Design a protein with these regions (language model features):
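Rossmann-like NAD(P)(H) cofactor-binding subdomain of soluble oxidoreductases
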Residues: 36, 40-42, 46, 63-145
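Small-residue helix-packing motif on alpha-helices
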Residues: 29, 39, 209-216, 238
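Internal alpha-helical scaffold of NAD(P)-dependent oxidoreductase catalytic cores
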Residues: 117-126, 142-180, 192-230, 275
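NAD(P)+-binding Rossmann beta1-loop-alpha1 motif at the extreme N-terminus of oxidoreductases
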Residues: 1-69, 76, 141, 204-206
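Short pre-catalytic strand/loop immediately N-terminal to key active-site residues, enriched for Gly-Thr
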Residues: 177-183, 235-240
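NAD(P)-dependent Rossmann-like dehydrogenase/reductase catalytic/cofactor-binding core
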Residues: 218-284
């Protein structure tokens, strides 16, 4: 597999690391990244591993090696830049990079940029749209994927393997559902972090130190999620097992219900979904 990254930031770094750790069959890998500090970080982190694995690699500010032009149709380009910079990054690509963008397979991991928009910029419909999340940085991410109808089953499998290197993958058949994916899992880590903030602050108000409250909050979430995943039981069943009639958990849950906790979460996700759809219109 030949891989060309446009953008060498955190998500590109996570993907490269995951692919190398998974012993993926990469023949060539190049990153177009104008920031010299980012180039140096990539070089420092991955050069030795790539040499050991026999991967032809390079990091450059503007151009891809000529070898990519020879196999453009079978190469992948990963668009790993911020959505507001995507159009400019595509327009500035020249030579072999332009050949891969126009003839190869394209995986975009930018929020809010539709498949049709990318296909229009590149005159290439072989586009897969992905929405990863930040836990991919520790190989615990989850990515929603959606592909143009012209993307072959083999190419879909390759795109899935790319994103599975940093976590789990969920396919959606209708692109508007990518806005829901963005709202739920793309933005989801921020909701979890806010919840931990709230738990920690509340624990401090009840007399615990910040360190105690943070440790209790983080490990309660980690343990509860591990139990949920390993038990195979629905979250409602596990919740009921913790909740004794007239007990402390019942009192806390009743307070959450009075404050319409479930409706609050639904409203938050709807707001994120609507903003994602709005961004898709802005980036046309």
């Amino acid at each position: 597999m030949n891989l060309l990254f446009i953008g060498g930031g955190n998500m590109a770094t996570a993907l490269i690391g995951g692919l190398l750790a998974g012993k993926s069959s990469i023949q060539r890998l190049h990153v177009i990244e104008p920031n010299t500090e980012a180039q140096e970080k990539l070089q420092s982190r991955f050069a030795a591993t790539m040499r050991a694995n026999g991967v032809e690699f390079s990091f450059h500010g503007a151009e891809a090696p000529a070898s990519f032009a020879q196999d453009a149709a079978s190469s992948w380009v990963v668009l790993a830049v911020k959505p507001q910079h995507m159009k400019e990054a595509c327009a500035q690509a020249t030579g072999p990079a332009r050949a891969v963008l126009e003839k190869g397979l394209v995986l975009s991991i930018a929020a809010g940029v539709s498949i049709a928009t990318i296909a229009g910029w590149l005159n290439n419909t072989r586009v897969v749209r992905g929405m990863p999340n930040t836990p991919a940085l520790v190989s615990q991410g989850v990515t929603g994927l959606c592909a143009h109808a012209s993307v072959s089953p083999q190419a879909r499998a390759q795109a899935e393997a790319l994103m599975a290197s940093v976590g789990r993958v969920v396919w959606v058949d209708q692109e508007p559902l990518m806005d829901a994916v963005t709202a739920l899992s793309g933005s989801g880590p921020a909701y979890v972090f806010r919840f931990v903030e709230a738990l920690t602050a509340a624990g401090e108000q009840l007399g615990l130190s910040h360190a105690q409250s943070m440790l209790l909050s983080v490990h309660t979430l980690k343990g509860a999620l591990a139990l949920l995943e390993s038990s195979g039981e629905p979250p409602a069943v596990l919740r009921e097992k913790v909740t004794s009639k007239g007990g402390t958990t019942a009192a806390a849950l009743a307070s959450l219900d009075r404050d319409e906790f479930m409706q609050m979460i639904e409203k938050a996700l709807t707001a994120a979904r609507d903003r994602s759809a709005e961004m898709s219109r802005e980036f046309r």
